[in-house]
Curated annotation (Swiss-Prot):
Pfam families: Synaptonemal_3 (PF15191). One of its GO terms (biological process) is positive regulation of developmental process. Changing Y44E: Abolishes formation of higher-order homooligomers. Abolishes interaction between SYCP1/SYCE3 heterotrimers. One of its GO terms (cellular component) is central element. The gene is SYCE3. InterPro entries: Synaptonemal_3. Its main location: nucleus. It is found in: Nucleus; Chromosome. Residues 7-75 form a coiled coil. Major component of the transverse central element of synaptonemal complexes (SCS), formed between homologous chromosomes during meiotic prophase. Required for the assembly of the central element of the synaptonemal complex during meiosis, via remodeling of SYCP1 lattice structures and promoting recruitment of SYCE2-TEX12 and SYCE1-SIX60S1 complexes. Required for chromosome loading of the central element-specific SCS proteins, and for initiating synapsis between homologous chromosomes. Chromosome loading appears to require SYCP1. Required for fertility and normal testis development. It comes from Homo sapiens. PANTHER family: SYNAPTONEMAL COMPLEX CENTRAL ELEMENT PROTEIN 3. This is Synaptonemal complex central element protein 3. Keywords: Cell cycle, Cell division, Chromosome, Coiled coil, Meiosis, Nucleus.
Amino acid sequence: MDDADPEERNYDNMLKMLSDLNKDLEKLLEEMEKISVQATWMAYDMVVMRTNPTLAESMRRLEDAFVNCKEEMEKNWQELLHETKQRL
């Protein structure tokens, strides 16, 4: 019986960790969806501004925004992986 108690706690901890991980992944997915919508609107704006002489500047801003978004998502993903490994 004494052996079952730590195993049960370990199982409960694992379930909580998986639940927390699932919530974190859902939050990241929601953020990625928001970013995708923003990128879609930015792309739409670029098409609308096609004849605008400032197209090159707008493209540079779009690229900068994409790179910043990508870096932030990679950073968040690495932090999440690191936290998950620490819990194990």
